[in-house]
Amino acid sequence: MAKPFDVSKFRKSITKSVPGLSSGFRDPDTWISTGNYTLNKLISGDFNKGVPLGKVTVFAGESGAGKSFICAGNLIREAQKQDIFVILIDSENALDEQWLQALDVDTSEEKLMKLNVAMIDDVAKVISDFAKEYKSLYADKEEEDRPKAVSYTHLTLPTKRIV
């Protein structure tokens, strides 16, 4: 009979080789409200929670459905209320400063970094570079001493097949 796999050595070596890596489950402890109690309840099971920080959340839908209002407006504003720094990556160059300010989003450089990119590859590079820099600065700090940041990416994806 084969011995059961001893994961303890692997866990120890992998967590040492990747700075900031943790193992096991990590339930979210920070939630960002969508500004809509019904949507919060659908996403999180709680009227006051909304989107979990540290998880990937996608809002998709038809043009005019309110994705930009919910995400660019409400989620960014609510994140800023919790002192969460926002990186806004806009591939459409569709989110203008006056519109965001009208939704009570603080567009100052201390609270928001807006980046305009053209290609999906650029989005991946920006997020990857940010994650590497964040890890290099904060991997050795206790979780409560790390600043919180969130990336909101505004992408247009083709909805029809182009031949």
Region annotations inferred by a language model:
Residues 2-110, 120-136:
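The Walker A/P-loop phosphate-binding site
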